[in-house]
Amino acid sequence: MRDNHYKLFAREDEKARQRFERDIVRMIRQLYNCPCIGLWVPFNEGWGQFDALRITDIVRKADPTRPVDHASGWFDQGGGDVRSVHNYFRPLKVEKDNRAFVISEYGGINCQIPEHSMSSEVYGYHQTSEEEFPGAFTDMMKTVQGLVSDGLCAAVYTQVSDIEEETNGLLTYDRKARKA
């Protein structure tokens, strides 16, 4: 899907798009010397995405030293330096592309430990018990490691710790219990 359908992406307001362009350049200039930033991601999962190819050019001009994931996870426009996929439901695999292939979100193994949770509500993609979580996580890591020989360049497990209703972290919300 092309990302110039501004209404569909909730970007009808031209002034808001202009502010985004101004602010992303300001942000890059402010954070340019932070060594922990390895990659710029102007759009994640289509939230407010618009003109990603043109925005990638703006980002590259502001910082030509770092790669760009122009549209992380969803509405890939064929630009940027990586092909970025979010995959919680399908078998993990490498898709062939001329860019580096990255599984930029995967995991979602839900394991709620009630006494360490923020909420009684739970959200996750694969339900497990406290006893099952370490094995499920290890199996997923083995699958990801096996994809390196197929061309996988990076992978990001979601997520390090539980947040409010999402209990798919390696640590609980209060950081007092480690699940794997």
Identify the role of each PLM range.
Residues 36-40, 95-180:
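Substrate-binding clefts and catalytic carboxylate motifs of secreted carbohydrate-active enzymes
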Residues 47-51, 57-60, 79, 88, ...:
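Solvent-exposed, non-transmembrane amphipathic alpha-helical segments
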Residues 1-82, 91-97:
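Active-site mouth of glycoside hydrolases
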Residues 67, 82-84, 102, 169:
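Generic structural signal for residues positioned in beta-strands
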Residues 72, 86-87, 105, 174:
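Residues at the C-termini of beta-strands that transition into short coil/loop
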Residues 47, 75, 89-90, 107-110, ...:
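Short, solvent-exposed loop/turn segments at secondary-structure junctions
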